[in-house]
Amino acid sequence: MLENPLIQQVLFEIMDEDVVGFDVLSVLINTNEVTDDEISRQLDVKLNNIRRILYKLYEARLVDYNREKDEETNWYTYTWKPSLEKVPALVAKKMKNVLKDLKEQLELEETNMFFFCSDCEIKFTFEDAMDSGFRCPQCGGMMYEYDNKKDISILKEQINYLEDEFNKNPLFSAY
């Protein structure tokens, strides 16, 4: 399941783009139940970093934990285990949101005329450009008409790719 690029992207975002998170998940999947301290030693990563990743995964409900108190030291030991059955639903929800945003952007691109400040590299709608007298509000430079055909093409490609991935992957068929 973790080999799927869409799943990897969503997990990457959940873990704040920390690639060590994939190593943490691999340890959890391979051992099924492990303490944060054992993960830290096994990966040779600081315990605080491991805990931060585990908390992010827990917030997304992708891991669970058990807490046990050592009667001699009064310290708590947290044993973590994967709970990846929610991954397909999480990815499906994220994909639907991304598709919705891409389709809204595509509609905006297809129904508007744009102008561009080449100095600031900022794109403006016709209305915004007209309101500022076709002068960039950032630098005062002239705005020029922007041909957004390439942007439209890229958006369509992204939408088609995501829809194809979503439709062909059996993990997401229930969503």
UniProtKB/Swiss-Prot annotation:
Domain HTH TFE/IIEalpha-type positions: 3-88
Regarding domains, what does the record say? The winged helix domain is involved in binding to DNA in the preinitiation complex.
Q: Which domain of life is it from?
A: Archaea
Q: Which GO terms describe its biological process?
A: regulation of DNA-templated transcription; transcription initiation at RNA polymerase II promoter
Q: Which organism is it from?
A: Methanococcus maripaludis (strain C7 / ATCC BAA-1331)
PROSITE patterns on file: HTH_TFE_IIE (PS51344)
Q: Which SMART domains match?
A: TFIIE
- Any one GO molecular function term: DNA binding
This chain's function reads: Transcription factor that plays a role in the activation of archaeal genes transcribed by RNA polymerase. Facilitates transcription initiation by enhancing TATA-box recognition by TATA-box-binding protein (Tbp), and transcription factor B (Tfb) and RNA polymerase recruitment. Not absolutely required for transcription in vitro, but particularly important in cases where Tbp or Tfb function is not optimal. It dynamically alters the nucleic acid-binding properties of RNA polymerases by stabilizing the initiation complex and destabilizing elongation complexes.
State the UniProt keywords alphabetically.
DNA-binding, Transcription, Transcription regulation
**Family assignment?**
Belongs to the TFE family.
What is this protein's name? Transcription factor E
Q: Report if keyword DNA-binding is assigned.
A: yes
